[in-house]
Swiss-Prot record:
Record GO terms (molecular function): ABC-type vitamin B12 transporter activity; catalytic activity
UniProt pathway annotation: Cofactor biosynthesis; adenosylcobalamin biosynthesis
Keyword Acyltransferase: no
Organism (species): Herpetosiphon aurantiacus (strain ATCC 23779 / DSM 785 / 114-95)
Biological process according to GO: cobalamin biosynthetic process
SUPFAM superfamilies: Class I glutamine amidotransferase-like, P-loop containing nucleoside triphosphate hydrolases
Family: Belongs to the CobB/CobQ family. CobQ subfamily.
HAMAP family according to UniProt: CobQ
Gene3D superfamilies given in the database record: 3.40.50.880, P-loop containing nucleotide triphosphate hydrolases (3.40.50.300)
Protein name per UniProt: Cobyric acid synthase
Domain of life assignment: Bacteria
Amino acid sequence: MLAPVLMVVGTASSVGKSTLVSALCRIAARRGIRVAPFKAQNMSNNAAVTANGEEIARSIAVQAAAAKLTPSVQMNPILIKPEGQRRSQIIVQGRPWQTLEAIDYWQRKQLLWEIVTNSLDQLRQAYDLVIAEGAGSPVELNLKAHDITNMRVATYAQAQTLLVGDIDVGGIFAAMLGTLMLLEPEERQLIAGLIVNRFRGDPDLFTDGIQILEQRSNKPVLGVVPWLPQLGLPEEDAVALERPDQTTNNAALTIGVIQLPAIANFDDFDPLAQEQGVAVRYINQPHELQHCQALILPGTKHTLAARQWLTEQGFDQAIQQFQGPIVGICGGYQLLGQQIDDPEAVEGIGGSMAGLGLLPITTIFQRHKQTRQVQALSNLPWAKAYPLAGYEIHMGRTELLADQPAFSIQQAESTHADGCMRANGKVWGCYIHGIFANTEFRQAWLSRLGWQVQSAIQPIDPFERLADHVEACLEPNLLTKLLGQEIRD
């Protein structure tokens, strides 16, 4: 017998679907329900690596953590990583499949439906409940024939489906009622209820709004979820960086992260932003560097295009003259070197470009993609021999022109160098994503910048905080009411 599926779809992108799925996963898990997240297809350059070296969306790995599970590739069988110029790398079952333009992918998309259903069925066989997430809106009519993520999944699984709307951006009635109107009748029947997300103020003032939605939709409003600030969970994609909520006024230390084109895995820097007295500021203009005590060049899906963009924006001289510490992660590490070569046009345009010249390294792109979890030791003078854990996702091979490795990767029978540093450790870079999630290393680097460790405060589990917040706003025993005895004990 296959386990039931609870589906979460939204009126648009960025309405809070991923966060709601995380909340529902933790609510179910702490009741003893063996629950797994699922998203047929995700488009994001924020990726995670499973224990088997497979690449999935970072948001799915977060949902797996909420469900108290180790992430697996079945939870996200298809990942689309935009590279710019209408091209994307398609990851299928955790491995690179093809790099395609959008129209080519649409034409081949239906070939992947069997992979989607096989992955979903495997989860339904292994767990008591699967909570599936849609993508964007389920009623993008010009794209719906090619949609393998939203109501096609719900229909296949006959899933009880929640429709989520973001009231904070306005237009909740048009968004909710319009979405329901545009669904096919058989799809509309699967909608079990509506969730109004990100409500600011007193929810009691929305009583009339609930009545309007219920009367016009013939669907119950199952919850009004208030805005929850500073959640402490990674954002799904770079849309979040456009929100004007970067508060640095009260920070003793501001770290600038250059918002490169096709920025990738920017959740690497969330642990920095969560430290008291530290602000992470995403910057687009060279003059913003004057407000920063340290600078980070993040990962990017298109290193050569990012290098050209830095020159066009006037960053070259500003970076060269920056007096504070400089760090490069993955693509940002490549940018700090002497030369970047792409003879096989792995990134699409090919060619060679000079790097920023701050580290003695050269990089050449290859079609083989390195994806793995790693354990390492730091060689940096202010964090000597600190143990680290993280993961790598890259297609370039970088050679050191001087014997100055920043880290030593520890493997079963050997070690090898990763990253590079200047002798004093002021400028360094590496391929290790998640490096700042290592508390001892993170705080050592911040201390080098003049930051002082704050008094120890027992951290609150963000998943528990989220689950408490959402559960208090939903219909009591929502999962049981929706799924009843279908959830296996």
